[in-house]
């Protein structure tokens, strides 16, 4: 029997899992600074709920089946639709505006390739109950600071640059209506969203199947506008006149300028996201040189929550989603030797080398002291005792074990050290060994914490 994972699904070894969890922690730290509240929703939902606003492409990719009770269920393809259902279900318990964060796995039957899997992790963030441009700008600022935290602070030795492309569905729909193509808007939006994926020529071919050539040329000309933000806005105003959606985009840009982060944003009318529930601002983010597609995408959805219940009035929402596994793939592509452990405080790792069978109990008592020396638990040191079987293990094998787990400090206690209430501490990054008391050992390990790196 060939033992392997399903196509598009993968195992994560400890090193891979370490990178993933630190990406999650970096994103969480940014969202926490904005007061987003963490929630969770089921992986399985009723199919009719998930498919309400999914679009034809998504419907083809969804994992859908009958459960043992004969119910038509599907695995979530994103975290946005389940969140809208969550709001509709729990509206009486929520204080609006509600800031939500959530991370978890989602499932899509896509063509699997690097950066595109059938099971992958997302970290979402949304604000519901807020329909002003400030909400849009707040979400876009989260995207900026989240990517900055990951790519400019998390990774040592590289300075990854990124750009956040954004558009507005209202601007595009206004133009389609001007062309007399209002009823074709969803068809057009789904196709122009593919321009960067399959090229403008193939998109043009698809549009010509249902739309006259003159209109197609006008659409492709609009979404290909070049120049500065001001140039594009002036061009749009000359075409659409006094337009509410254009004003919205201007207000968002002014807010981003207030934060002095506007240079990382690009008004790009090719962005439409291809999902039927978006109604306003939409965005995608690109890491230069990665060729991985968007690492954080999203937009405004004003009608999604109310579509789940007739008793709920319109509740506006806007949000985005970080692609954790795609971000990890970009990190994997980089040629660097170390990844800094940043989170809140890097935890030092210690291995107590098993030297003497007569000191087994003492080793475990010592490990407990390392783990619990700080009452607040914030500055404790992760530590383990090497398991010694009946055949024993020599010191070389124990050191190799420490290196394989990227443990930095080895602690040696033989009979002589035990009698003196001392220990030898070896720093594997410096190849130095010192005879120290327990408190001195703690100080040595903690003082080196700021420089702690995990070799890969």
Swiss-Prot record:
Compartmental location: Cytoplasm
Gene3D superfamilies associated with the record: Anticodon-binding domain, Bira Bifunctional Protein, Domain 2
Enzyme class: ligase
GO biological process: histidyl-tRNA aminoacylation
Protein EC: 6.1.1.21
InterPro entries given in the database record: aa-tRNA-synth_II (IPR006195), aa-tRNA-synth_II/BPL/LPL (IPR045864), Anticodon-bd (IPR004154), Anticodon-bd_dom_sf (IPR036621), His-tRNA-ligase (IPR015807), HisRS-like_core (IPR041715), HisRS/HisZ (IPR004516), HisRS_anticodon (IPR033656)
One MF annotation (Gene Ontology) recorded for this entry: ATP binding
Highest taxon in the source lineage: Bacteria
Subunit structure, as described in the record: Homodimer.
Similarity annotation: Belongs to the class-II aminoacyl-tRNA synthetase family.
NCBIfam families assigned to the protein according to its UniProt record, in alphabetical order: hisS
Protein name (Swiss-Prot/TrEMBL): Histidine--tRNA ligase
Gene responsible for this protein: hisS
């Amino acid at each position: 029997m060939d033992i392997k994972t399903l196509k598009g699904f993968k195992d994560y070894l400890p090193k891979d899992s370490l990178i993933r969890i630190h990406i999650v922690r970096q994103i969480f730290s940014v969202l926490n600074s904005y007061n987003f509240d963490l929630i969770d929703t089921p992986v399985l939902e009723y199919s009719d709920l998930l498919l309400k606003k999914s679009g034809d492409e998504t419907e083809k990719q969804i994992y859908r089946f009958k459960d043992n009770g004969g119910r038509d269920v599907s695995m979530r393809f994103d975290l946005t639709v389940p969140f809208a259902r969550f709001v509709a279900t729990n509206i009486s318990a929520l204080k609006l505006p509600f800031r939500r964060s959530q991370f978890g796995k989602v499932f899509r039957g896509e063509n699997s390739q690097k950066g595109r899997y059938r099971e992958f992790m997302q970290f979402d963030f949304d604000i519901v109950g807020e329909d002003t441009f400030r909400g849009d700008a707040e979400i876009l600022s989260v995207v900026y600071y989240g990517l900055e935290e990951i790519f400019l602070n998390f990774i040592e030795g590289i300075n990854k640059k990124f750009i956040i492309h954004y558009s507005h569905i209202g601007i595009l729909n206004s133009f389609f209506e001007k062309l007399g193509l209002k009823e074709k808007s969803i068809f057009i939006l789904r196709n122009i969203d593919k321009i960067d994926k399959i090229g403008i020529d193939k998109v043009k071919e698809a549009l010509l199947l249902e739309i006259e050539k003159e209109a197609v040329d006008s659409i492709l000309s609009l979404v290909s506008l070049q120049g500065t933000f001001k140039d594009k806005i002036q061009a749009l105003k000359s075409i659409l006149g006094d337009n509410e959606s254009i004003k919205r985009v201007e207000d968002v840009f002014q807010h981003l300028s207030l934060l002095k982060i506007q240079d990382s944003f690009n008004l790009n009318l090719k962005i439409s996201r291809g999902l039927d529930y978006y109604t306003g601002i939409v965005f995608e983010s690109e890491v230069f040189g990665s060729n991985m597609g968007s690492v954080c995408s999203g937009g405004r959805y004003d009608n999604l929550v109310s579509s789940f219940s007739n008793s709920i009035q319109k509740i506006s929402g806007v949000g985005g989603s970080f692609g954790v596994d795609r971000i990890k793939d970009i990190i994997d592509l980089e040629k660097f030797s170390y990844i800094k452990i940043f989170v809140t405080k890097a935890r030092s790792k210690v291995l107590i080398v098993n030297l003497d069978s007569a000191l087994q109990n003492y080793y475990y008592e010592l490990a407990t002291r390392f783990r619990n020396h700080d009452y607040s638990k914030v500055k404790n040191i992760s530590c383990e005792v090497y398991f010694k079987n009946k055949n024993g293990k020599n010191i070389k094998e124990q050191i190799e074990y420490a290196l394989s787990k990227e443990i930095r400090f080895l602690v040696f206690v033989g009979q002589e050290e035990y009698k003196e209430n001392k220990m030898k501490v070896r720093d594997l990054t410096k190849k130095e060994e010192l005879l120290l008391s327990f408190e001195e050992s703690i100080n040595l390990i903690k003082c080196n914490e700021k420089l702690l790196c995990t070799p890969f």
